[in-house]
Amino acid sequence: MRRDIALFSGQWADLPLGDVLDKAKGWGYDGLELASWGLHLDLERAVSEAGYRDEVRNAFAERGMTINAISNHLVGQAVSDRYIDERHARVLPPAIWGDGEADGVRQRAAECMKTAARVAALLEAPVVSGFTGSPIWHMIAGWPPITPEDVDGGYELFAEQWSPIIDVFDEEGVKFALEVHPSEIAFDYWTTKRTLDVMDWREGFGINFDPGHLFWQQIDLVGYIQEFGSRIYHCHGKEAALSLNGRNGIISGLLEFGDLKRGWDFASIGHGDVSWDRLIRALNAVGYSGAISVEWDDAHIGREDAVREAVQLLRSYSVERTGGAFQEVFK
């Protein structure tokens, strides 16, 4: 069976859903990773209004397209972040932000993540992708000094916050895929392992594998896939490109994307330093059969050009695993 190539609709949420579906189908995509913001999916309406759900389903069915995943990245960030501030206010729905009081924001965000699981089940989407936030990301520099107890406490708090959410995912038969990403509880190899450990490797909690966030950290992408393949539930299609010229630093965190003083930047597929041929082989080898969801995060290429090229390149790599079939002619 041919692997689905999906378009992540988050960077297209300014356009009506039907328009994005028409564009995506015309470019050769099989479906969408459907963003739960902008003009694409209202979770509260979807969980309570059968007619609204039918509208969403029909929009896909009429075009022969699939809901490969539902994204709730923006809200998920607020569940575990230690500090809730104006950054969250810019991206959270008003109903989640409310009066901005931190505990209330976290509680409403947690309930919204549960709603996302219920909506995914109703719309027959197998995965909800998203962020989690982190109680300890603000300690990343290690100064002022931190202790092992500080870090342990952060992971324990994370498990307390997310276990009840994943209970609902389990009840609904839907997987949650954390996009491993700086600012989240898992951002590299070792923090991925620790996060899965603290969540007891429960099946409802897994990974959205995005090489663009790992490559610039010098993580072995194929090794990462081999280690965590059983918990890779979703995959983003993008790259990163390094520009370490003796002046540009690897952190680059306070520079806008696209600034030439950055030591790395996101790149569209085919325009960075990631070998998607090798990644597809590795994903096939660990049995990943889900979609690759193309995400436009490139400050140097327009979104239509980027995603049109990406699906063509991925299609040339995204063949099903052959196993040992090529040897059958010799038997």
Q: Language-model segments: which ranges?
A:
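Boundary/entry segment of secreted carbohydrate-active catalytic domains
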Residues: 1-15
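Acidic/histidine-rich catalytic cores of soluble enzymes
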Residues: 4, 31, 70, 146-273, ...
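Active-site beta-loop-alpha junctions enriched in small/polar residues
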Residues: 8-12, 35-39, 72-75, 133-135, ...
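Active-site acidic/histidine proton-transfer and metal-coordination neighborhood
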Residues: 14, 19, 23, 62, ...
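Catalytic domains of carbohydrate-active enzymes, especially glycoside hydrolases
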Residues: 20-38, 124
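Conserved, mostly hydrophobic/aromatic
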Residues: 24, 32, 60, 70, ...
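Glycine-rich, proline-tolerant flexible connector loops at the mouths of alpha/beta enzymes
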Residues: 35-57, 136-139
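Aromatic-rich peripheral "rim/lid" segments of glycoside hydrolase catalytic domains that contact
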Residues: 299-331
